UniProtKB/Swiss-Prot annotation:
Coiled coil: none annotated. Belongs to the PPR family. P subfamily. Transmembrane segments: none annotated. Residues 1-84 are annotated as: Disordered. This is Pentatricopeptide repeat-containing protein At4g20740. PPR repeats lie at residues 157-191, 192-226, 227-261, 262-296, 297-331, 332-366, 367-401, 402-436, 437-471, 506-540, 541-575, 576-606, 612-646, 647-681. Keywords: Repeat. It comes from Arabidopsis thaliana. The keyword Repeat applies. InterPro entries: Pentatricopeptide_rpt, TPR-like_helical_dom_sf. PANTHER family: PENTATRICOPEPTIDE REPEAT-CONTAINING PROTEIN 4, MITOCHONDRIAL-RELATED, RESPIRATORY COMPLEX I CHAPERONE (CIA84), PUTATIVE (AFU_ORTHOLOGUE AFUA_2G06020)-RELATED. Residues 59-70 have a biased composition (Basic and acidic residues). It comes from the Eukaryota. Residues 38-56 have a biased composition (Polar residues).
């Protein structure tokens, strides 16, 4: 019997309404999601903006400017917070609670974290794995893993161990991850092959070849035999990281286990043998591959050729090419291109051109890069006509020459004195809306100077200025290029004198010319440029003063060189290594031992990689504390083994060390041994012995004066009429 209906209720049956999920956020009602971090979502108030006509602002496409080698910028990766929030939405509530407990305590394990976790009735292995997959702190992850394992009746499963291994590797603790198999075994869950595979894959992806072999050895100790796939992974990691002998040892184990090679196995070995240059063994492996499995395909042969070309072994790559033809494998464009580029870079442009003609005969699409490499090869061989013919072929094939091809042909034309044609090509490059650089213009500029067409050279400079290129930078690079050839130094000076009248002088150009004249031995002319630079109002920089230091030392004016060194220090700059070497040499010649050692220490303190003789000078000083001639000679022997020349600085270091810590007798023993070995001449021995005596006298006098001042005897000596202290 139906119960009576309550009063005041409509006849229509009640239908309950359930709200599923979060409400839709609006401008006034944000929605808060719980998770790793509070995610307060609200819709911002967007001011209405007039829609612009996108077609009006779109840049028209110009096929002439299109370059197939350019790529669109990759899409920006999602931010870290986005990744974390997305991952937290997939977490179970308990895993989210655990991660929130870590976050509240700033990822520091302690009693507060343990008290939070103890609120949970139980943490299952799946929860442990879920938490460790997002863990970014190895210490907290290890503590949590250990805490979970102490639960009553709890036992980690394979997923938890695997997640722990990934967490340790992700945070750089891969050595600790390698100990997980022992941990699993001690906790009553022996590892399976999968755990070792994970460790091997992690090390292989991070290019840790020796670690891969270490895990492989551990795998054998646990009694596991890898499958073919895992063997391939191990050998590939060892080959890629340069441990080919270990890869061969693993291959021997592979054969002892009675496994059958796959094509991947053969290719790993072949590529390793190619890298090691063991071509005969590689050909034997290829023959076994043909007999036992199948012939290598075009991709396998291309990989071999690419490996050999990258190692610079072109003879072996041609042998592999012959093997490919013997197997009746048709090369593709990648195989042709790899070999042609390698041959041209190795100077075998004729052989590369033969392969190029084969490609044309087979109607294979030829890349512009192949044209460019062939043109550069012909220019390097002096076959400019062939390079120009190839350019015509390039244009007929529908390509537009890039700036690299222009640079190569311009350089070739200038080498055969066709500088006018080269200049026309430069103008064509500008009309084609390319961007010529110094590499384009330098052959033209040098050719005009060599042919003594200085007016045309000036016109080129004006054209450079009109195009908006930095004339001063181009001139600096030009003089560097010209002064690199000693025969063209005189031409460089002639050009400079003309440019100077047109206001194109600069400190950098003066420095280049000063250094060139110094290397030629024309010290006076180099210094005259230095004085001229100052007279014209240019402020010398540290390089200018460094070159002047070298010049003054060669001239014999060490005092002036020292004054320039002080100016460099006042500028808060560092002299060049050449200036340090030159100044120490000059100070050695006038017997300023302390100043030499001071400069040695200053140089090694200021310069990133100082001269080896300076480093050994400090070593000699340190060894002299033992006052043992044999120890000093051991350092000298080490210098000879390292190929370091024993010069004045080392002699000064011996004098400085022995005058402070040793005796004159021990120093003479060292000099006598150096003379016996014909390292030091008899005249040098006499000079340095005198320096040794003088330096010892100085140090003895310094000790006496220090003692007088320490005991307060100065006033008594002056009262008795002693005037030595005044001097």
């Amino acid at each position: 019997m139906k119960s009576p209906k309550p009063p005041n209720l409509s006849d229509k049956s009640l239908k309950p309404n359930f709200f599923h999920g979060h409400r839709k956020p609006s401008q006034n009602r944000p929605t808060v999601y719980g998770g790793l971090f509070s995610n307060r979502q609200s819709i911002p108030r967007v001011s209405p903006q007039p829609q612009s006509n996108s077609l009006a602002h779109r840049t028209p496409f110009d096929l002439r400017k299109w370059d197939p080698e350019t790529h669109l910028p990759p899409p920006s990766p999602p931010s870290h917070s986005t990744v974390i929030s997305a991952a937290s939405e997939r977490l179970s509530p308990i895993a989210r609670f655990v991660l929130d407990a870590f976050r509240k305590n700033r990822n520091h394990w302690g009693p507060s974290v343990v008290s939070e976790l103890n609120k949970l009735r139980r943490v299952t292995p799946s929860i442990v794995a879920e938490v460790l997959k997002l863990g970014n702190d190895a210490a907290v992850a290890a503590k949590f893993f250990h805490w979970a394992g102490k639960q009553k009746g709890y036992k980690h499963d394979f997923a938890a161990y695997n997640a722990f291994a990934y967490c340790l590797n992700r945070n750089g603790h891969f050595r600790a991850a390698d100990q997980l198999p022992e941990l699993m075994d001690s906790q009553g869950r022996p590892p399976s092959e999968k755990q070792f595979e994970i460790l091997i894959r992690m090390h292989a992806d991070n290019r840790r070849g020796l670690r891969v072999y270490y895990v492989y050895e551990k795998m054998k100790k646990f009694g596991f035999k890898p499958r073919v796939f895992l063997y391939n992974r191990i050998m590939d990691a060892l080959v890629k990281n340069g441990y080919f002998d270990l890869a061969l040892a693993v291959y021997e184990d592979f054969k002892e286990d009675g496994l059958v090679e796959e094509s991947t196995t053969f290719m790993i070995l072949v590529k390793g043998l190619c890298k090691a240059g063991r071509i005969e063994e590689m050909l034997e492996i290829l023959q076994r591959m043909r007999e036992n499995l199948c012939k290598p395909d075009v991709f396998a042969y291309t990989a071999m050729i690419k490996t050999l070309v990258s190692e610079g072994n072109l003879d072996a790559s041609l042998r592999v090419w012959d093997e490919m033809r013997r197997d009746e494998i048709k090369p593709d464009v990648m195989a042709y291109g790899t070999l042609v580029v390698g041959l041209c870079k190795d100077g075998r442009v004729e052989r590369g051109y033969e392969l190029f003609m084969e490609m044309k005969g087979k109607q294979i699409l030829i890349d512009r890069e192949i044209y460019r490499v062939l043109i550069e090869g012909f220019v390097a061989d002096g076959k400019v006509r062939s390079a120009c013919n190839l350019w015509e072929d390039l244009v007929d094939s529908g390509y537009i020459a890039d700036i690299g091809i222009y640079n190569a042909v311009i350089k070739g034309l200038c080498s055969v004195n066709q500088v006018d044609k080269a200049y026309k090509l430069f103008q064509v490059a500008i009309e084609e809306e390319l961007e010529p650089d110094f590499e384009t213009l330098s052959p033209i500029m040098v050719a005009y100077v060599v042919m003594n067409r200085l007016s045309d050279f000036s016109n080129v400079l004006e054209r450079i200025g009109e195009l908006g290129y930095p004339v001063s930078d181009y001139l600096t690079q030009f003089f560097k290029l010209l002064c690199a050839d000693e025969e063209k130094n005189a031409m460089a000076l002639d050009v400079f004198y003309i440019l100077k009248t047109k206001g194109h002088g600069s400190v950098s150009v003066y420095n280049i010319l000063m250094e060139a004249l110094y290397k030629m031995g024309d010290i006076q002319k180099s210094l005259s440029l230095f004085y001229e630079m100052r007279k014209l109002g240019f402020e010398p920089d540290s390089s200018s003063y460094s070159i002047a230091i070298c010049c003054f030392v060669e001239k014999g004016d060490v005092k002036a060189a020292c004054s320039f060194h002080e100016k460099i220090i006042e500028m808060s700059c560092v002299p060049s290594i050449a200036a340090y070497l030159s100044l120490t040499k000059g100070l050695c010649q006038i017997g300023e031992i302390d100043a030499v050692m001071l400069l040695v220490r200053e140089c090694l303190g200021n310069v990133e990689s100082g001269p080896m003789e300076f480093k050994y000078a400090l070593t000699v000083c340190h060894v002299c504390k033992g006052s043992n001639a044999e120890k000093v000679m051991k350092v000298v022997d080490e210098m000879n083994q390292e190929g370091v020349f024993i010069n004045e600085v080392i002699y000064c270091a011996i004098i400085s060390g022995m005058s402070k810590h040793g005796t004159i007798k021990v120093a003479r023993e060292v000099f006598t041994e150096l003379k016996k070995r014909k390292v030091m001449t008899e005249a040098d021995m006499v000079v340095y012995e005198e320096m040794l005596i003088e330096q010892t006298k100085k140090k003895t006098a310094d000790l006496v004066l220090s003692g007088i001042k320490f005991f307060g005897l100065e006033s008594k000596l002056r009262a008795k009429g002693c005037r030595l202290l005044d001097n």
